[in-house]
């Protein structure tokens, strides 16, 4: 159903996916999904309803209670946090471009891109270069972090993924009482 997949290979891939799904559904004793809509899609693809079950992601809410808040460095800033892997599926380039436009409207904005970038170094370098080419101030790539050290400093979190299941970053943001801006993919709508 992905509209962004183009070319002659799309139908071949869909056919192979359906075959693999049927095999897994026939041989499996329990088929789990992260959220209800994914379960419905599995049933649509031929999984017997009695084999399906929703097992949502979970986090330890207590680990994100009483976390450190804003620092002196944050004075006068509106911190926007993105907790993610810097990879194409997270569409970090769109996030950077959108931030660039928003920054022109409100100079208080600061974007924190928090998470590893080593998985796809070429894409990460393209993201770094985009920030440089657009001459956007106040974009920070932290690399891998302990979420407790940063999440309390954020005013809002953002996720621009083109595909998701049930993102932990959204659950963590809610646990820390932070609002979320997210693309409408997977279970990002709640």
Give the location of each predicted region.
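Short hydrophobic beta-strand element within catalytic cores of glycosyltransferases
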Residues: 179-182
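Nucleotide-activated donor-binding/catalytic signature segment of Leloir-type glycosyltransferases, i.e.
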Residues: 124-144
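Membrane-proximal helix-turn-helix segments that form the acceptor-binding/catalytic region
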Residues: 11-31
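Carbohydrate-associated surface elements
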Residues: 37, 58
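Aromatic "clamp/platform" in nucleotide-sugar-dependent glycosyltransferases that forms part
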Residues: 162
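Glycosyltransferase donor-sugar binding loop
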Residues: 83, 110-125, 141
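Short alpha-helical donor nucleotide-sugar binding micro-motif in glycosyltransferases
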Residues: 144-145, 149-154
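Conserved donor-binding/catalytic core segment of Leloir-type glycosyltransferases
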Residues: 32, 73-90, 96-99, 103, ...
